[in-house]
């Protein structure tokens, strides 16, 4: 059993301007809107430990970044051959090009690096690994947008509603009002609370 802080999830949703997250799968890694779909995959961290269980043990970040980059492209390609059963699901995934990448083997990797689980060193390592995945994923996503074009949602125009103004007070601060029209890419990149954090990474 578990619970979801659905208001917080919606607050941090990149696509806050065009969807409401309703639920998540039992493990909680991918909250989705109605008919939403997200292709998931994980990178096995144990494969990047050099000299495991020794004093020379280290994590090969160069190899890790390369695999994350390739995997980002692979997941994006799977969007196009998704095989989803419902037309609404197929529209959702091709319109937003959503995919999700995570990690597995963290505990084993920490043991291979001789880091006690829960130590300050292990917490910092975990933050570093996740940050590197996010940054490399964003880097590849930008390259993919240049090669394939952006996801259709980015080029669509959205009319600002009272609900959007309430969710994002920054719109009013920037001089926008109800009825104004903005591109999805602006609403996504500038006004998503999650995307605003990229500058701090």
Pin down the residues of each PLM region.
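Extended amphipathic alpha-helical segments enriched in small hydrophobics
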Residues: 97-116
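Glycine-centered flexibility motif
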Residues: 41, 100-105, 149-150
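Short secondary-structure boundary micro-motifs
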Residues: 61-62, 100, 126-127
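Eukaryote-specific, cytoplasm-facing alpha-helical/coiled-coil scaffolding segments in long proteins
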Residues: 16-19, 98, 132, 168
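Function-dense linear segments that define catalytic or interfacial modules
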Residues: 1-3, 7-93, 105-109
């Amino acid at each position: 059993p578990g619970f979801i802080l659905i208001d917080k999830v919606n607050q941090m949703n990149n696509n806050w301007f065009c969807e409401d997250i309703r639920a998540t799968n039992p493990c909680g890694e991918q909250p989705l809107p109605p008919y939403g779909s997200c292709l998931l995959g994980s990178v096995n961290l144990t494969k990047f430990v050099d000299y495991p269980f020794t004093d020379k043990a280290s994590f090969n970040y160069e190899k890790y970044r390369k695999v994350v980059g390739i995997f980002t492209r692979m997941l994006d390609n799977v969007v196009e051959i998704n095989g989803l059963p419902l037309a609404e699901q197929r529209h959702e995934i091709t319109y937003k090009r959503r995919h999700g990448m995570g990690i597995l083997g963290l505990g084993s990797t920490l043991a291979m690096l001789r880091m006690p689980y829960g130590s300050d060193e292990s917490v910092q390592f975990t933050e570093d690994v996740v940050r590197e995945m996010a940054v490399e994923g964003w880097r590849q996503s930008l390259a993919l947008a240049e090669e394939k074009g952006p996801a259709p949602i980015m080029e669509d125009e959205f009319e600002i509603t009272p609900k959007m103004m309430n969710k994002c007070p920054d719109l009013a601060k920037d001089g926008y009002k109800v009825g104004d029209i903005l591109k999805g890419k602006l609403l996504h990149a500038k006004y998503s609370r999650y995307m605003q954090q990229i500058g701090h990474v």
